[in-house]
């Protein structure tokens, strides 16, 4: 009988594992080991259940010869009504700063509370498509390697290898439309990766599939470092942070002129295809911001209010932090990701301590042999839409700097925006949230009341950027101004229904330079009609609904089978126990001894990585516990409060020094999470490529 019960438990556990929901067509033998089924606060704080996304995470091996693993965390909407065949790859910057900032502070489905538990972010981008956060280059966040890369060409090479391995795990997604999104120094990463994908698509070999890249979204991007640094002094002056009567004005103006000379030299050789030292080095121009932050201190204010926050000029911070203690919720993210149970739940192979930024990666990644990414934008714009969005309150990668390099750039037959004053109002949820300038497949979007991290400040608004780049908006005249109108999730359909047949209601707008234009270049460079795009999306959604229904029906059948088996075994067991002992076996003088001997034995039941001991099945049962409850208890481990995984040693126990991308100098003197350092040694004052420094402290480009 005990053998039957043991076999039954194994069988039922196998059924339950096989019934786990998977994405359409995914290979359970490869992808399921990356499944994330629990996190602190997940089932307590995220309600209803269909709000919990389907998650996969882990350290994916991309180059075994150098032990290079990229950590990824993927979120998919579990609601079949919103499923789309769309993949969004999100990258943060640095270089060397983790994309977990994006996942847990910006565009992901979760934020982290002070109890280190996940809570809901209602503006999550995973409702617009599968979103994958990747820690790269190797050494960043939870990613690791025996060697670190140094240049942007390598970033593209390594990421394409990651994509190859990713699609081996999820082969059904290889035909999905792809978007890249990120911010700050990702303004260097993303153009290089996108260019490499487009080049790859032009020289496919047998057995390779095209990557359907549809567009890129770069938020407050560090795309043309020296040109953007020229905007610092005008920004401070225009926003009343300094004036021409300031005692240091002449000094600042002289440094501004030095930077201008460098930019003039860059402009004179911009198209020669040569990597010039004066273009890949930006330390002279970046020093302008360092000095501005120092010279504009308000020494009469409280200590924590003396310096302008470089990421949001409306905020103040202590000097020399000047914004590096922000965003304030960042203090919750590190402790959350350093919990051993969380590392196990994220399927880590290497339990490395998570640091927001890795100083060693930043020092190694000098990008001295790669031209700045601004050079790649014209070629990208020939094939895909390029969206550059900016929080209006940011200083370090501000809107003036972005418009400045765009006005010099030649793309698709003309230079800059032909009429940058022709601004289109962006309306979201009946409010004007910014303006758009869009020509020839490049768009600039200035977003009001937001910082360097737009999704952190305005998660719902930022999610609607996906609607803009995919054409899911209405073009209207609002208060006499041309406007693009986007809506909260689901409300566009309601708005269309209330219009009661109004012309163009419910259809995707296809704005362009003329009313007769039939394809929105913001959607793609292909010649497919918008109706075919809608048909494809509708078809994929219907397919997803059908598969979801089939999957639910299958799981119901499996549950019914399990219950029937339980009942049958219970009946057999009850019948067995109710029979006279003489029928079962012949009484002997040593029966009691045998019984006592059997009852004294223990059996070891392995659950996950730990061993728990249970009493023999023939021991006395609790009055209210039946065989079903007992079996379920063994399957679920409900009485075991120690978790599913045994503790893992941390090697020699050495701790790493934190690298926090956006802050240093926490108020708690015992927890300094804002020291710039590395995985190997304690460091302060290291200036990363592409990030200005002040008082020997790094200002990373997240």
UniProtKB/Swiss-Prot annotation:
Region (Disordered): 491-531, 582-603, 659-702
Active site feature: 184, 394, 452
Gene Ontology molecular function terms on file: serine-type carboxypeptidase activity
Compartments in which it is found: Golgi apparatus, trans-Golgi network membrane
Signal peptide per UniProt: 1-19
Alphabetic keyword roster: Apoptosis, Carboxypeptidase, Glycoprotein, Golgi apparatus, Hydrolase, Membrane, Protease, Signal, Transmembrane, Transmembrane helix
Swiss-Prot/TrEMBL catalytic activity: Preferential release of a C-terminal arginine or lysine residue
Record field: compositional bias (Polar residues): 587-598, 692-702
InterPro entries: AB_hydrolase_fold, Peptidase_S10, Ser_caboxypep_his_AS
EC number(s) recorded for this UniProt protein: 3.4.16.6
Cytoplasmic side: 577-702
CC annotations in GO: membrane; trans-Golgi network
Glycosylation: residue positions: 85, 122, 441, 449
GO biological process, one term: proteolysis
PANTHER family: PHEROMONE-PROCESSING CARBOXYPEPTIDASE KEX1 (PTHR11802:SF190), SERINE PROTEASE FAMILY S10 SERINE CARBOXYPEPTIDASE (PTHR11802)
Family from the record: Belongs to the peptidase S10 family.
Name under which the protein is recorded: Pheromone-processing carboxypeptidase KEX1
Native organism: Candida albicans (strain WO-1)
Gene: KEX1
């Amino acid at each position: 009988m005990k053998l039957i019960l043991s076999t039954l438990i194994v069988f039922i556990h196998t059924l339950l594992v096989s019934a786990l929901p998977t994405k359409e067509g995914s290979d359970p033998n490869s992808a399921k080991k990356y499944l994330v089924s629990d996190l602190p606060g997940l089932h307590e704080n995220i309600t209803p259940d269909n709000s919990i996304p389907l998650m996969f995470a882990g350290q994916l091996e991309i180059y075994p010869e150098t032990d290079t693993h990229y950590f990824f965390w993927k979120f998919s909407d579990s609601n079949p009504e919103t499923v789309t065949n769309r993949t969004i790859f999100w990258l943060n910057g640095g270089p060397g700063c983790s994309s977990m900032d994006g996942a847990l502070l910006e565009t992901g489905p979760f934020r982290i509370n002070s109890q280190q538990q996940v809570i809901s972010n209602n503006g999550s981008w995973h409702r617009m498509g599968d979103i994958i956060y990747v820690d790269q280059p190797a050494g960043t966040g939870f990613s690791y390697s025996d060697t670190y890369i140094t240049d942007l060409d390598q970033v593209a090479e390594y990421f394409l290898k990651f994509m190859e391995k990713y699609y081996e795990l999820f082969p059904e997604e290889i035909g999905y439309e792809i978007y890249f999104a990120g911010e700050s120094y990702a303004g260097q990463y993303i153009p290089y990766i996108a260019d490499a994908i487009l080049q790859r698509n032009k020289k496919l070999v047998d057995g390779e599939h095209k990557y359907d890249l549809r567009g890129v979204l770069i938020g407050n991007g560090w795309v043309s470092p020296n040109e953007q640094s020229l905007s610092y002094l005008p920004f401070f002056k225009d926003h009343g942070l300094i004036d021409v009567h300031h005692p240091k004005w002449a000094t600042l103006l002289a440094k501004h002129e030095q930077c201008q000379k460098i930019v003039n030299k860059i402009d004179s050789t911009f198209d020669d295809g040569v990597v010039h030292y004066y273009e890949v080095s930006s330390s002279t121009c970046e020093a302008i911001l360092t000095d501005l932050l120092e010279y504009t201190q308000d020494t009469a204010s409280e200590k924590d209010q003396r310096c302008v926050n470089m990421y949001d000029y409306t905020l103040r911070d202590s000097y020399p932090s000047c914004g590096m203690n922000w965003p304030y919720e960042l203090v919750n993210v590190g402790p959350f990701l350093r919990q051993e149970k969380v590392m196990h739940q994220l399927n880590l192979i290497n339990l490395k301590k998570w640091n927001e930024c890795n100083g060693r990666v930043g020092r190694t990644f000098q990008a001295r042999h790669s031209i700045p990414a601004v050079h790649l934008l014209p070629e990208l714009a020939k094939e895909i839409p390029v969206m550059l969005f900016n929080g209006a309150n940011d200083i370090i990668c501000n809107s003036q700097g972005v418009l400045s390099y765009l006005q010099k750039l030649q793309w698709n037959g003309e230079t800059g925006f032909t009429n940058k004053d022709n601004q289109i109002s962006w309306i979201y949820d009946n409010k004007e949230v910014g303006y758009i300038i869009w020509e020839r497949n490049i768009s600039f979007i200035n977003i009001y009341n937001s910082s360097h991290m737009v999704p952190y400040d305005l998660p719902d608004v930022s999610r609607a950027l996906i609607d803009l780049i995919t054409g899911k908006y209405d073009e209207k005249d609002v208060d006499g101004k041309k406007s693009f109108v986007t809506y909260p999730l689901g409300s566009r359909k309601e708005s269309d229904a209330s219009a009661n047949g109004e012309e163009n209601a419910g259809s995707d707008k296809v704005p362009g330079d003329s009313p007769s234009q039939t394809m929105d270049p913001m959607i793609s460079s292909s010649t497919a009609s918008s109706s075919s795009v809608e048909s494809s999306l509708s078809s994929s959604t219907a397919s997803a609904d059908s598969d979801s229904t089939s999957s639910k029906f299958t799981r119901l059948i499996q549950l019914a089978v399990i219950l029937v088996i339980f009942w049958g075994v219970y009946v057999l067991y009850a019948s067995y126990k109710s029979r006279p002992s003489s029928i079962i076996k012949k009484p002997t003088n040593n029966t009691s001894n045998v019984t006592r001997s059997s009852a004294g034995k223990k059996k070891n039941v392995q659950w996950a990585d730990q061993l728990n001991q249970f009493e023999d099945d023939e021991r006395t049962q609790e009055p209210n516990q039946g065989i079903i409850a007992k079996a379920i208890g063994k399957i679920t481990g409900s009485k075991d409060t120690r978790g599913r995984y045994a503790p893992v040693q941390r090697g020699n126990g050495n701790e790493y020094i934190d690298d926090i991308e956006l802050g240093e100098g926490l108020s708690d003197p015992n927890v300094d999470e804002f020291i710039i350092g590395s995985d190997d040694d304690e460091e302060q004052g290291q200036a990363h490529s592409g990030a200005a420094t002040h008082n020997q402290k790094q200002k990373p480009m997240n």
